Amino acid sequence: MRGLRPGNQVSAASRLLLPAAACALAAALVMGFAQTAATPSAGDIVAADFVDVSSRVGVDFVHQAPHSSRKYLLETMGSGVALFDYDNDGRLDLFLVNGAPFPDFVPKGTIPQKTGPEYWNRLYHQKSDGSFEDVTARAGLEGAGYGMGVAVGDYDNDGNEDLYVTGLGGNHLYHNNGNGTFTDVTAKAGVGGSGWSTSAAWVDLDGDGFLDLVVLRYIVWDWDDVWCGARDNRGYCHPDVFPPISMLVYHNNGDGTFTEEAHQLGLDKPGKALGIAISDYDRDGHPDIFVANDSMLEFLFHNKGNGTFEEQGLEAGVAVDGDGRTFAGMGVDFADYDNDGWPDLIVDDLANQKYALFRNAGDGTFNYDSYVTGLAGVTLLHSGWGVRFFDYDNDGWKDLLVAQGHDLDTIEKTFPDLHYREPPLLLRNLGGKKFVNVGPASGDVFTQRWVGRGLAIGDIDNDGRVDAVITENGGPAHILMNRTATANHWLGIKLVGHKSNRDGIGAVIRVETSKGSQWVTVTTSSSYLSSSDVRAHFGLGADTAAKTVEIRWPSGIVQTLANVAGDRYLRVDEPTAAPNTKPTR
C-alpha cells in the first residue's frame, strides 16, 4: 500500500516520483523492458473467456467502506473472500468479508461495529442449479467489527471447514457445526488477538496432524491519524509513518484451544504484513512462511525443523526487488510456475514498482525474474492486491490473475497515468519462460475498471476450468466464471488426511504427464485477505490421464497412483502405512 507521508504532497509522494519525471521514467522503462522480452506471437495470445455472473446467480454483496474526509487508512484496504464447500455437497460456496460504519471523526480506541444487514459478512450457499442463496443469518455468520480477511481450514479434523475472520481490534473463529450453522468459539479457542489483523493462514507447522494458525498484523495504528498530503488534498498516510507489529501464531492444542507462540517459534519479527504464502521452498519436508510487508523488507521464515524458524529474506534474495529496493508488498502466491519442482514467488505491489517474480534456484535462494519474463514491463503502471497462479487453459503451465486498483482515490490528480480503478490482469505463462498479457483479447471483464482488493480461485461449477472471485473496496464482488474454450484435459484432487490434517494442507502433489511433471502444494492461503478452493488442480494438456500422481503427505507418507484418468475430481485418502522417505522430485 502506497500512501503519503506528513507534509506537502511533493515531498510526501517522493517515492512515487514527480508527475513529469514519473511519466518519462515509466515510458523509458516500459520501452526498455519491451526490448528484453520478445513480442508475443498470435499463437501466444490464447484468449481466455471469463464472464462476470454475479448478478445473474444471486450474489448482490457490496463491500461497505466509509470514505471520510480524514482519510483513515483502514477505509482503503478492502476485504477478502473465500471459496469453500462448507456443507460438503461437492459445490463451492462463497464467503465475503465486510466493513462497518464509522463517522468522519472517530475517537481513539474505537472499534467500529456492524449496525445493520448492509454491513454483515455474507455466506452464499451454491445450489444445484449454480445459483447462490444468502444463508448468512441461518448460518450465524453476520459477523462483528470491521472485517478484513478470511482463512478456511478444518482445525478440529471433523470433516467440516471452519472460518477465521480477521479485522480491526479482534478476530473471530467460527466452528462449522456440520448442520449448516457456525458457532463463534473465539473466546474458548483463545484466538481473538488484538490490533489490526490482515491475512491469515492455516498450516500444520509442527506435523502433529492439527492445523495451526498464522495471523498477520499490519501496523500499530489508531484513529488519531496524522495529516498526510497537501493542505487542500489530504491523502492516506504512507505506512512509513506507523510502527511495525509482529504477527500472531497460534499452536493448535488438539482440544479446541490454541496457544500463541510467535516468540517461541522465532516468528515475532515486527513487520507491516499484508499477504502470506506458505510452502516448503527448500523441499526439506517442513513448511516455510513468506510474508509480504508493505514498504519494508519482505520476510521469508525458514522452518529449521526443530520447532523454530529463522528469517532468511535477504539471504534468499526475496527481501527486496531486483534493483535492491524495498517495495509495497501486498498480495503473494507460492507456486511452481516453471515446472522444475521448486516453488516460486509472486509478490505484487503499487504502481511504479513492478510486480516481483522470484524464481526458486533450488539452492535456498531465488532469482528476480520480473525483467526476463516480461512481467516488469506489463506491471510497471499497475497496483496489485489479490494474486494467484492458476492454469486457466489447462495447458499444464500456471498463469497469473491479479486484482488491481490503486490505494489512493485521488491518485489521478497527481499522477494522470495511474488509476484508482483498474482492470484485472490476466497473464499467460509461455512455458515457464515468459508471461504475456492476454486480458485485452479476453473479453469484457478485462476492460472493466474496479477497485480490486481480494481474490480467490476455485472451480465453482466443477467443469475443470478454474474460476475466480474478486472483491472491490467499497464496491461489489465479481464472480468470474471461466468459459475458455479449450480441448485440453485436467485433473482435480481432493485430499482427505487421516494421520495428517484432514484437509491435507501442506501436502505436495506431483502429477506426471507426457510433457513432464507439475507440482502443487495444497493450501487455502496466499493472495490478499482471501482463501481459495483447497482442491489441487492440474492442466493435463492433450493427455486424457496422468501417468503418475505422487502425494507427499504432511505426515511424511508418500502415496503413488498410476494411470489416473483425467477430466474429473478425485478424492484421495491418506493411507495408514509407515512414512516413506522417498523424495518427491
Show which residues each predicted segment covers.
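Bacterial N-terminal signal peptides
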Residues: P19-G32
